[in-house]
Structure formats: C-alpha cells, structure tokens
C-alpha cells in the first residue's frame, strides 16, 4: 500500500504542538482592513487552537502528525 500523503495546504496552515493540540492563524486579517475597527484587528492578532470539532478533518489531512 502506498504512503499516505500530507495535504500541502494543511502543512502550510497548521502546526502540531507537543501536547497534541493544533495551532492556526487567524482569518480576516489580510486585506480590507480600513473598514475594520482597531479593536477588531487587535483581537485578530496571534495564534489560536483549532476547535475540537475540526480535529478529525485535520488529522486526515496530516496523517504523519499522529493526531
């Protein structure tokens, strides 16, 4: 049976932390920022964890991550 391939888009977007959680960047922070408030842009900073309900699809996209 051939090797399971990792989705190239997923390996660029997600990183697995040592505890088994997956971190991701925030969306809505790339363009059209003039109409967004400063408070809204400030809350979009930083890294957040992937929601528990999405971990199944992330595990399928990253088979070698051991999730």
From Swiss-Prot:
One of its GO terms (cellular component) is cytosolic large ribosomal subunit. Keywords: Ribonucleoprotein, Ribosomal protein. PROSITE patterns: RIBOSOMAL_L35. The keyword Transmembrane does not apply. Coiled coil: none annotated. Disulfide bonds: none annotated. One of its GO terms (biological process) is translation. GO terms for molecular function: structural constituent of ribosome. Belongs to the bacterial ribosomal protein bL35 family. This is Large ribosomal subunit protein bL35. It comes from Acidovorax ebreus (strain TPSY) (Diaphorobacter sp. (strain TPSY)).
